[in-house]
Amino acid sequence: MARPDDPFESQDDVSDKSEDDELDEQDAVSLLTSDHAEVKQMFEEYRQLVQNDADDDRRGELAGRICSALTVHAEIEEDIFYPALRERLDDDLALDQAEVEHAIARDLIEQIVAMEPDDALFDARVLVLAEYVEHHVQEEESEIFPQAEKSGIDLDELGAALAERRHELRAELEAD
């Protein structure tokens, strides 16, 4: 059963198929774009919590969910999506830049995870991460995804591989 604060489980089990199952059937670009939208929504919620001076527990819980979602997303891109594209694309610069951006985001995530929500600069770090990720997403969706769609790669097969690995990583995080 999903915990109410679990960002990876659907709370709406009204059909035989869960939301996760439906997302798992997406092609690679659609799956990654859905992840982007999910994280964007969480960042918007975080901004609202900061603006409304929400308590530390609520901000800390949401920041943890954001960091977990970004960690899983970056790993599936780096382990599966980017290598598959490298085999098909002539120009690796956009992928190289995306991986560097992931490394910088990972550093910020590590700083956030090591902090408490009432620490100085906690909110600032989460909000800078939001801005950074929004920039990365914009580049990825406007440059890398169109290249992927034109590359001839089987995006459905790649989407299935991404979904499977994402499910494994989420299960590992939940077990910790």
Where do the language-model regions lie?
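Small-residue-biased structural context
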Residues: 1-176
